[in-house]
Amino acid sequence: MSPAGKGPAWRQPAILAAAGAAHALSFAPDPLPAWSLAPVQVIALAVAAHASLQAPSARRALARGWLFAMFSFSLGLYWMYVSMHDYGGLAAPLAAAGVLALSAFLALFPGLACAAARWLCPPHWDASPPARARRTLYTAATWAACWAALEWLRAVVLTGFPWLNISYAHVDSPLAGWAPLLGVHGMALLAAFAAAALAGLWQSASGRIDSRQALAAGVALLLAGAGWLLGQFSWSRPEGKPLHLRLVQGNVEQSQKFDPALLETGLRRHLELASLPPRPGEPKPDMIILPETVLPVFQDQLPASVWDAWIEVARRADTRIAMGVPLHTQPDGATGHRYTNSVIGFDASTPVEQLRTGTTAMRYDKQHLVPWGEYVPPGFRWFVDMLDIPLGDFDRGAARQPSFDIAGQRIAFNICYEDLFGPELLPALQDGPDGRPGATIMANVSNLGWFGNTWALRQHLQIGRLRTMETARPMVAATNTGITAAIDARGRVAAALPADRAGVLPVAVQGMTGLTPYARFGDKPALALIGLLLIAAAARGRRPRQP
């Protein structure tokens, strides 16, 4: 009997809840092995597809899709509880309610996708076998387009929160080969199609599978095979010599990081790690990269002696240093003040005054700010006041900012969860209007200590891997508590430090040049394909069926 078959009233909600929980496990290795993530994701989502398509109405389909997604988000984002309760100081019931409220909101998007697909694709058991086979293919494509469209909408509404996009379960599957062409939303379309095609195999009133109903599943297999072939193609080419980098993971406990009494302890730890001599046979680093908010106070609140110490590290190592730091600046001629979450770069020749005023030549200001943590959405000041979050409102950086030019390579920085928003990384990789060439390496600095040693760390690494596949650019990640890593241009983790451990990661990173179709056009091709499928579905899906 299919998952939507007859049975006790509790049966189907229980199946959807279990499938949603299994779905949450598919977004990063541990506890599941990497090879199993894609199959688990497709099978779990197929349960939701089948249940929603066989719902008696679009409203019931919405409820079924929402229930599935509610369990998926609640478990997959459980680490939000850690940030709100353990480090934000929110009472346990309120922190749990916060996670559930966020999950309930996010689950509306999959729920609406299921409702739209059910409205466009009513059950068709009365159709002839050939028509049923054609309708199975059409239904799978329509359901996938609805799901992918709502995934995209989730990425843009209210600044967007596309964490747990289904594509991230497929960084080790053949579908990853499509990333350089269609990006995260195109992969979501293909993954959702595979799930709906599998659901189509269950859509038989007798419980038997008609061979003609396997048409959609066959197309899904062909798309996976094409993805594998595309994955063999090199979309970029090396430029210059490999860049030698030292990535620092300070592992400062989040509960201590912003404690004024422990400020000196954290600074000393990062100074010591940055000052370590290279191991025997290891070349000196061209740049030392430290995580987000290495300095947990604004740069002008520190005495000049702190900056003197950092300049001395750069002088002794004969290198440049990049670090995350909150900046307080007053632009020339401006009467106001700017507060930004930034990365600054400097070397032994950088004047201390530039460091204290935040006017270094190498600088990146975060542009996609975290709601409640880095800016306060209108009407939510009461919620922020309940949380013990330091620093507060920041100003946004420009959409395109200069890369850091180091030893013939050009590094484009992003901060925290900015690597979740692929289109926003692309301007830095493209040649500028002034002819300045695009970046050859991406670098993410973050502080995931807010979430403890949870799934968030491994999920974030998967996100970074997909960004490198989309752009055919390597990425390095320097984090406070993990996972500090180097990812090559094909999305493979070349080296990584264990989480919750202080250390340094010396890596040689080969810069790459050349634009993938996704790096050139962004989400436009995928959205065009999704839009065409939805237009076709709207034009055809509600036509009266011929008897």
Swiss-Prot record:
Keyword Membrane: yes
Domain CN hydrolase: 248-511
Pathway connected to this protein: Protein modification; lipoprotein biosynthesis (N-acyl transfer)
Keywords: Acyltransferase, Cell inner membrane, Cell membrane, Membrane, Transferase, Transmembrane, Transmembrane helix
Catalytic activity, EC: 2.3.1.269
Main location: membrane
Subcellular location(s) per record: Cell inner membrane
Gene Ontology cellular-component annotations: plasma membrane
TM stretches of this protein: 31-51, 65-85, 89-109, 144-164, 181-201, 215-235
Membrane topology recorded in Swiss-Prot or TrEMBL: Multi-pass membrane protein
PROSITE patterns: CN_HYDROLASE
Positions annotated as active site in the UniProt record: E292 (proton acceptor), K366, C416 (nucleophile)
Gene Ontology MF terms in the entry: N-acyltransferase activity
One Pfam entry name: LNT_N
UniProt-listed GO biological process terms: lipoprotein biosynthetic process
Function: Catalyzes the phospholipid dependent N-acylation of the N-terminal cysteine of apolipoprotein, the last step in lipoprotein maturation.
Annotated family: Belongs to the CN hydrolase family. Apolipoprotein N-acyltransferase subfamily.
Entry-linked PANTHER family: APOLIPOPROTEIN N-ACYLTRANSFERASE
Name listed for the protein in its UniProt record: Putative apolipoprotein N-acyltransferase
